[in-house]
A protein has these predicted regions:
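Donor-binding and catalytic core of enzymes assembling or modifying cell-surface/extracellular glycoconjugates
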Residues: 211-283, 289, 293-295
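Histidine-anchored nucleotide/phosphate-binding helix
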Residues: 51-63, 203-211
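A short, glycine/small-residue-rich beta-strand->loop->alpha-helix junction that serves as a flexible
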Residues: 43-52, 188, 194
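Short catalytic/ligand-binding loop motif for oxyanion handling, primarily in non-cytosolic enzymes
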Residues: 49, 70, 76-81, 186-189, ...
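A structural signal for short, well-ordered beta-strand segments and their strand-loop junctions
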Residues: 39, 67-73, 178-180, 221-223, ...
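Acidic, PIN/NYN-like endoribonuclease modules and their adjacent C-terminal/linker elements
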Residues: 293-324
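Secretory-pathway luminal glycosyltransferase catalytic domains
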Residues: 3-37, 76-216, 313-324
């Protein structure tokens, strides 16, 4: 393909995905009707992807004046062999379906939903219509700032759900930094999503310097898979390693952190959407929220901006930090 043809394809993609999609969403919002239902059962994915699918569905329904109905997770990739009720445990733990209509109840009244692949395919916003999408990422990528309208609701539901037996790694009185590094067998064919230790070290150096400027006690924890030897570049920062640990504990610790460094992963991206802390984002396939700090592709991060945001966060956080 010639450079000119590539540029033409790029412009065509931009026009279709950005301009036309915005026009479709504007028309949908204008025509939206009471009792037009939307659900996002997700695909056959892992926890992070399925959780993020539902969060994007809640966002789309809320902003477009539709009614979100909840489809609980029934199957998750990487479910332990001895945990047949693993998806149900996560539903109870996350609590996102609390207060929402159940998809099965709406289907009982209206019949099975009409399935489409993208929210732009929903053309009839009429009363008593029922739509099912794998996710609403296409909408969320255009309007990531609108997640801020729901962040309080997400956090309240999550923290109201029972966390029985879940060990959280959080030190009261300190600045708790959680760093998620993506490793594991799921990356065999997705090596571009793996977190590099040298990038993490560069980012941690900036974080450590900023914490020194702010003053006070801090604890840095690294959550990942593998062995400590795989992360030897990070030992110089005195981090606590939490490797191959219980997934509930890991996720909860990410959500609770005062500072959360997310990986190129729906798992930590979804945790960030539930978090009340300061989020440090590295460019990936899902867009950041406007109140997140974005590092460069080379893991660079503006130290002065981080110091400023840390001080503002610490001045306003409750005594228990990001805890509810």
């Amino acid at each position: 393909m010639t450079p000119k043809a590539k540029e033409s394809n790029k412009l065509q993609w931009w026009w279709t995905e950005r301009v036309l999609a915005r026009a479709v969403y504007l028309k949908q919002r204008w025509l939206s009707a009471d009792r037009c239902y939307v659900t996002c059962p997700g695909n056959e994915d892992g926890l992070g992807a399925q959780l993020q699918a539902r969060l994007s569905g809640m966002l789309y329904a809320h902003c477009q004046g539709l009614t979100y109905v909840h489809s609980p997770m029934t199957s998750l990739h990487f479910t332990p062999a001895n945990e047949p009720d693993w998806p149900a445990k996560w539903e109870r733990f996350l609590g996102l379906g609390a207060g929402e209509l159940a998809a099965r109840d709406v289907a009982h009244d209206l019949g099975e939903p009409r399935r489409v692949n993208s929210p732009t395919e929903i053309q009839q916003m009429i009363r008593d219509s029922f739509w099912s999408l794998p996710n609403c990422h296409a909408y969320a990528e255009l309007y990531p700032h609108r997640y801020l309208r729901l962040s309080q609701r997400f956090a309240e539901r999550y923290h109201a759900a029972p966390k029985d037996g879940c060990i959280s790694h959080y030190t009261p009185g300190a600045v708790n930094v959680a760093v998620h590094l993506r490793r594991g067998s799921d990356l065999t064919h997705k090596m571009h999503l793996m977190s590099r230790s040298d990038d993490a070290a560069a980012l941690l150096q900036t974080i450590v310097d900023a914490l020194h400027d702010v003053g006070g006690r801090s604890v840095i924890r690294v959550f990942s898979q593998g062995a400590e030897e795989d992360f030897r570049e990070l030992r110089q920062f005195g981090v606590e390693f939490h490797l191959n640990e219980d997934l509930f504990s890991t996720f909860h610790s990410l959500v609770l952190a005062d500072v959360l460094v997310i990986a190129k992963s729906s798992f930590s991206y979804a945790a960030a959407l539930l978090s009340r802390g300061l989020i440090i984002y590295k460019p990936m396939h899902h867009a950041p929220l406007p109140n997140w700090l974005t590092s460069g592709a080379d893991a660079s991060l503006d130290r002065s901006s981080l110091v400023r945001r840390l001080r503002a966060y610490l001045d306003s956080r409750p005594a228990q930090g990001a805890l509810p």
